[in-house]
C-alpha cells in the first residue's frame, strides 16, 4: 500500500503570479471588503472558477460551428442556472467578458445580505456559519455556497 497523497489546492488556478503587485493588492482588498471574504483564498477560489468558465468558452469558440452546436447550449444553460449570465441565449463573447464579481454575487453570503436577511455582509456570514440560514429547507453552513437561480427564492432564516 502506498502513502496518501496530499490533496491538490483548488485555488491555484486563480492565484496571481505576482501577489505583491500594489494595484492587485488594492483591488483584492476592495473586493474582500465589499463581499465580506475572510481571506484571499476565497477570492482565489472564485477566480479559479471564473477561469474554468472562460477557458471552456474559449475552447467552444475555437471549434467549428458544427462541433460547437451540441455543446454550446448546455454550457450556457448551466451558466444561466447558476446565475452567472442573465439569458441562456447570450453569445459566447458575453461569457468571456464575465468577471470575478459575477461569481462573488452568487455566493450565499452575498445573497443573504442582498435579500435583507442580515444587517451587513459580515452579519450574513455569521448567520450562515452559525447555522441560521436554510436553502430549500436544508441548513447550509458554508458562506461560499454558490446558490443556483432556482434556489435563490428558497433561502430562509432559521431561529
Swiss-Prot record:
The keyword tRNA-binding does not apply. It comes from the Archaea. CDD domains: S4 (cd00165). GO terms for biological process: ribosomal small subunit biogenesis; translation. Keywords: Ribonucleoprotein, Ribosomal protein, RNA-binding, rRNA-binding. Residues 106-158 form the S4 RNA-binding domain. Pfam families: S4. SMART domains: Ribosomal_S4, S4. GO terms for cellular component: small ribosomal subunit. GO terms for molecular function: rRNA binding; structural constituent of ribosome. Part of the 30S ribosomal subunit. Contacts protein S5. The interaction surface between S4 and S5 is involved in control of translational fidelity. Belongs to the universal ribosomal protein uS4 family. One of the primary rRNA binding proteins, it binds directly to 16S rRNA where it nucleates assembly of the body of the 30S subunit. With S5 and S12 plays an important role in translational accuracy. HAMAP family: Ribosomal_uS4_A. This is Small ribosomal subunit protein uS4. It comes from Pyrobaculum neutrophilum (strain DSM 2338 / JCM 9278 / NBRC 100436 / V24Sta) (Thermoproteus neutrophilus).
Amino acid at each position: 500500500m502506498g502513502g496518501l497523497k496530499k490533496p491538490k489546492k483548488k485555488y491555484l488556478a486563480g492565484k496571481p503570479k505576482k501577489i505583491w503587485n500594489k494595484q492587485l493588492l488594492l483591488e483584492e482588498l476592495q473586493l474582500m471588503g465589499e463581499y465580506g471574504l475572510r481571506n484571499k483564498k476565497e477570492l482565489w477560489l472564485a477566480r479559479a472558477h471564473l477561469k474554468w468558465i472562460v477557458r471552456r468558452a474559449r475552447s467552444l469558440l475555437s471549434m467549428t460551428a458544427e462541433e460547437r452546436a451540441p455543446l454550446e447550449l448546455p454550457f450556457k444553460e448551466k451558466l444561466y442556472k447558476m446565475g452567472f449570465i442573465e439569458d441562456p441565449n447570450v453569445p459566447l463573447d458575453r461569457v468571456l467578458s464575465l468577471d470575478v464579481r459575477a461569481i462573488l454575487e452568487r455566493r450565499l453570503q452575498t445573497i443573504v445580505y442582498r435579500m435583507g436577511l442580515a444587517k451587513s455582509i459580515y452579519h450574513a456570514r455569521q448567520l450562515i456559519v452559525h447555522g441560521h440560514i436554510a436553502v430549500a429547507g436544508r441548513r447550509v453552513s458554508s458562506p461560499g455556497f454558490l446558490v443556483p437561480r432556482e434556489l435563490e427564492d428558497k433561502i430562509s432564516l432559521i431561529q
